[in-house]
Amino acid sequence: MSILDWLIVLLPVAFVMYMAVHSRSYVRSVADYLAAGRICGRYVISVADVANALSIIVLLTQVEMYYKTGFAMSFWNKMMGPLGLVLSLTGFCVYRFRETRAMSLGQWLEMRYSRSFRIFAAALRSVSEMFANMIMPALAARFFIYFLDLPHEFTLFGHTFPTFMVVVVITLSLATTIICLGGTLALVITDTIQGLFCYPMLVIFTVFVLCTFSWTKEIIPVMSDRVAGESFLNSFDVDKLRDFNVFALVVTIVVTIMHRASWIGAGNTSAAKTPHEQKMANILGSWRNGFMTIFYVLMAITLITLFNHRNFSEKSKAIRNYLSHHISLQMVKDDAQRAEFDAAIAAIPPVTHEIGVDEPLSQDKNMDTPYYDTAREQFFRINGVPELTQQLETLKATNPGDTAAIAAAEDELRKKTGLANKNTQEYSTLYRQQMLAASMRNLLPTGLTGLFCLLMILMMVSTDDSRMYSAALTITQDVILPFKKNGFTPKQHIWVIRLVTLGVAVWFFLGSSYMSQLDYLKLYADIMCSMWLGGCGPVMIFGLYGRFGTTLGAWLSLVSGMLLSLGGMLVSRNWADIVYPWLDKHGWLPALTNLLPKLSGPFEPYILWRMDPQKFPINSTEIYFITMMVSMILYFVGSGLTHLIWKPGPFNLDRMLHRGKYNDEGKPEEKFDWSPKAIWAKIIGITPEYTKGDRAIAYSVFIYSFVYGFGLSFIGVLLLNVFGVWQADWWKYYFFVVFILEPCIIGVISTVWFSVGGFIDLRQLFRDLRNRKNINDLDDGRVNNGVSVADAATVASEEASDDQK
């Protein structure tokens, strides 16, 4: 990068770090450090969430997905629009959790269930979260090595150091510094500033892509050049594109509802002035989320057009050579073998595919296929597979009676073949994940290169500090604090969190070093997250909205979900080499072969279970759904048994939510109005707390998301296709208007809107921090007899008053 690019990167990052240092002077209590004093406005939270939502791992995952599917699947994603809208407008889970005034998930779990359950659940969530997120610095480090063309190793004072680990240390140091300086307050302030930087940059890169590639002459021809069943444009011609059916949609809907609160309880979720402000921040998020999605789509379109259109054949060839060379530097240690590997890749000719003349591209045969095939041949050569194959054939021909030698040769061949296949898979994984880094390095001019690097750094820092802080907060508040009967002093409390944060940073460093090869990332993340997500849904939803749930039900739900998820994932991972042979050895295959089709029969073709020696018959989506249903059933069974045997009575929700006689904020109790107008307002989440401006925002979100986004652009187009009115050629206009033009207009407007609102709210936040007078040192997350220690005096007074009456 040029000096200008480095200035563009360093100055904003330095300003972000300065604001983190500045925030430290405003931390006067544990509540400030843990929940930003609970005085944040809606725009501060919403803009900060922009930075949290943008991450390198999400960018790479989304770009990889859209690179494989194009626009076509985006149309079907609109089916989820009404659900997300309703959840945002009603403040589902978020509003009630803020009403509890809990500083962490565990504090609420103890208020709702028990202390032992708090400790177990918090520990489980922390372990799951830390294992799943510790790979994020590794992904970021690898991205910057490819984007900045850094050497994989460098020598300093006669010692050789891996660049990868140095970048990881820098990444974690930035995140750890922000956390230790001001906790949630520092995160909110720095994330808001990063969000204010990010949104204009998204607009700039969107304009750049649309000006670099012609929509009608380059993008659409490439997107149209796909075989039947794998269309990148026609949303009704995607049956061979990926697994997509009614059952998958049902699971997505269930997951969206059941896990609405599964990761709640840290940072911004407890920082709003009131539950209403938290709810409005989520509603405002509906305006910003769409533009982030189009950024991911446009980055994928950039890669699709760049790598598949002959107008960019020379540039794409140079990028592919650069990308493969970096991968070979990482994977092939022998200089001579690496030179031969690079020469074989360089010998692949540039793109000569002529759209409309040559055979359309597919997932199995496309412009990347020659690179995967060549890499596979080279890895087989490097591992000596051809020589071992020849030696085995010679041994069988010359000495067929030497069974021991033949068996040993076969074992060695299998071992080397497996290693070559693993190397090929690792190459393809790195190739897909680093396509964006290599492409943007070679595509962007001076100035924009620095802006893109800045955007990636902000994505990295905002995500790493949030994930690390979430884990540190959960461990401190919900695993350590419950064992401290009298709590810590405020100063001790904050230092404990800082020390735990350092421990989490070390854990992330060690995890990144072991996960540096980036192999099986999705499977690994799924297994780790499922430890918590498998059974936490019923615990969260019915704990916030029901009086029936009990501690026994919560235990059964969480433990069963954890065991079923882990069991399903591990069986799936080891099916071909361990589980299937074991079933065959014990004679269970015939029975299972007959049983599985009978079990899936009522749900076919959406669920199809057939015995297969290579693949576990039940896929991950089905495992996830079964786990959620079993854990939900056990939650109610356990709760029912508790009420049947011990008869504890219904849980006191009013006390937990500070409602009714426990309302210490002077808010009038809302009485439901059964008039049509009131019912309609209730449906879209409007309450007496809404001002005229709030109502305008809520109605605008409803009209845009439901009436236009779902009604016209999805249901309307769906009906036109069903009745045969829609023409295949119309898709290019549809996607340009709905997925390009409209989000760009909204992006420009919302950039100005959120920037002004975020700046005003941020300034007000500093004013409120300076002018605070009532600071409660007991507000530190402790719970006593199901009541927050900070609320104990108020609750005792109200209950004593009731006893006198």
Model-derived features: where do they sit?
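Membrane-embedded helix-loop-helix hairpins and adjacent transmembrane boundary segments
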Residues: 1-753, 772, 776, 795
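Juxtamembrane alpha-helical signal-transduction segment immediately C-terminal to a transmembrane helix
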Residues: 755-758
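Solvent-exposed, non-transmembrane helices and loops of integral membrane proteins
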Residues: 771-794
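Long, low-complexity, intrinsically disordered segments
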Residues: 798-805
